[in-house]
């Protein structure tokens, strides 16, 4: 069975950089196959992407585009632009007409500034201040639309986590933990399992006294040994 990421992924710009956030649940139909998978992929030193859809497709597209950008960097001795990654992905996906189940959120910083793009499986793309994709994107985008504003790093991380949490709580295919990636001019900071969602606060074990169960009837059977 094909493994899908289910997914709530979020991207947003803040004052000095870009935030990417994603849940960590992977599913096979109605079954949770992985509670702590990684949906944030590194492309270059300052370009990252989140993947939704079929897990293998999203991962392979990210690896393919990363390879193209690194070849460009080694050949021309220039740092690739975020738009270069966007172009490689959209052209590759468009050739297959939606046959590749990969939806991506791309964030990064280059010589032209901070960039955030959403890329859909058919090859369409869009630039945005904030975006959410995946099966839990409805709850996430509602949170972003109601609370997004000019923010510093800590406020942006909190909003991104709250958006993913809203997606998790309204979508059975999203869940477990929240990974966060912060991209700014100093580099990339990846915060693995930054927040856990749905963990029971009551960790006390239940203890039943031995006399808590009443014995209403007792029968004694003789053991018959047969040789």
From Swiss-Prot:
Transmembrane segments: none annotated. Gene3D superfamilies: Glutamine Phosphoribosylpyrophosphate, subunit 1, domain 1. GO terms for cellular component: cytoplasm; nucleus; proteasome core complex, beta-subunit complex. It is an enzyme of class 3 (hydrolase). Its EC number is 3.4.25.1. It is found in: Cytoplasm; Nucleus. Its main location: cytoplasm. The active site is at residue 7. Keywords: Cytoplasm, Hydrolase, Nucleus, Protease, Proteasome, Threonine protease. GO terms for biological process: proteolysis involved in protein catabolic process. It catalyses: Cleavage of peptide bonds with very broad specificity. Residues 1-6 form a propeptide. InterPro entries: Ntn_hydrolases_N, Proteasome_bsu_CS, Proteasome_sua/b, Proteasome_suB-type. GO terms for molecular function: threonine-type endopeptidase activity. It holds the Pfam family Proteasome. The 26S proteasome consists of a 20S proteasome core and two 19S regulatory subunits. The 20S proteasome core is composed of 28 subunits that are arranged in four stacked rings, resulting in a barrel-shaped structure. The two end rings are each formed by seven alpha subunits, and the two central rings are each formed by seven beta subunits. The catalytic chamber with the active sites is on the inside of the barrel. Belongs to the peptidase T1B family. The proteasome degrades poly-ubiquitinated proteins in the cytoplasm and in the nucleus. It is essential for the regulated turnover of proteins and for the removal of misfolded proteins. The proteasome is a multicatalytic proteinase complex that is characterized by its ability to cleave peptides with Arg, Phe, Tyr, Leu, and Glu adjacent to the leaving group at neutral or slightly basic pH. It has an ATP-dependent proteolytic activity. This is Probable proteasome subunit beta type-2.
């Amino acid at each position: 069975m094909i493994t899908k990421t289910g997914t709530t992924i979020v991207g947003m710009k803040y004052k000095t950089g870009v935030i990417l956030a994603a849940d960590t649940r992977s599913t096979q139909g109605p079954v949770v196959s992985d509670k702590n998978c990684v949906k944030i992929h590194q492309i270059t030193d300052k370009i990252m992407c989140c993947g939704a859809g079929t897990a293998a497709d999203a991962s392979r597209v990210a690896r393919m585009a990363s390879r193209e950008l690194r070849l460009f960097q080694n050949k021309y001795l220039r740092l690739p632009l975020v738009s270069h990654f966007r172009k490689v992905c959209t052209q590759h996906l468009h050739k297959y007409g939606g046959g590749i189940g990969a939806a991506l959120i791309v964030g990064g910083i280059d010589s032209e500034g901070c960039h955030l793009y959403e890329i859909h499986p058919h090859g369409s793309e869009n630039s945005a201040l904030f975006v959410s994709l995946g099966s839990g994107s409805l709850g996430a985008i509602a949170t972003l639309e109601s609370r997004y504003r000019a923010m510093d790093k800590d406020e942006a991380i909190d909003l991104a986590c709250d958006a993913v949490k809203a997606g998790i709580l309204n979508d059975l295919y999203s869940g477990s933990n929240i990974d966060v990636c912060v991209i700014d001019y100093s580099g990339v900071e990846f915060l693995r399992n930054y927040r856990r969602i749905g963990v029971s606060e009551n960790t006390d074990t239940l203890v039943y006294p031995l006399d808590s169960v009443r014995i209403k009837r007792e029968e004694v059977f003789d053991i018959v040994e047969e040789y």
